[in-house]
Amino acid sequence: MQPKILIRDENAFGASGHSGKRLSPSWRGATHIVKLWDQNEYPQLAANEFFCLTAARKCGLDVSPYRLAEDGMALVIDRFDLRMDGTYRGLEDFCVLNARRTDEKYRGSYESQVMKRFTQFANSTHVNEDMEKLFTLIALNCAIRNGNAHLKNFAIVYDDVHGEARLAPVYDLVTTSVYIPKDCLALTLDGSTKWPAAKDLRKFGETRAGCTPAKVRRIFQRIAEALQETSREVNSYAQEHPAFAEVGQLMLREWDEGVNASLRG
């Protein structure tokens, strides 16, 4: 279980008469999520997720504002389901959309339980855009070797149950193979949990996301470029924070392998 703390920034809604941040633990009206990890079990996981989210943002995916603690021990993320008036948008993960219990989050396929299910609930005029983003996210998960992209790590958001539903911003993105060397896909793709070859991922994008071959190529290129750019930031951070160096190098090795096998192979 990953420890998470909900906190409220008292100034988030324009409160006057205060100087600086006023943060307090709160489950009601929480504005941020603070994610913590056992450093003995998953060393440098906060920095791991920080750079994976950075790569996602560079890919053009929606990512809620996030920041890494100065000591690298925690990741602070703005809640993306919070409205400016302090109320919350509707949020349903894909366990809920598939009528699955939480302990069934690893059961299913990206074809049926993610892509197909999304089309059944995405009643917005942006469905094609969101389908492309969903495919990009799945392809990115393959490239960074994230074996934790299960049903609870995809979601939709909405303002009204009868209104449009959109793909939620990216969250819980980690290179898990740094800690689990034999890790694999969380759900099946083309009947297998093995990391997909590029030809299988291309087929998935064309048949399930409705992308043209040219668009799939552009998506793969965008992911590869985003990871290359983020890799430079990983190296810079590792030089400034030697405790991260080993995990950082393992991440870059996994990214190189993921890009070469799943995007270019």
Predicted regions located by residue number:
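Anionic ligand-binding catalytic core segments
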Residues: 1-151, 155-265
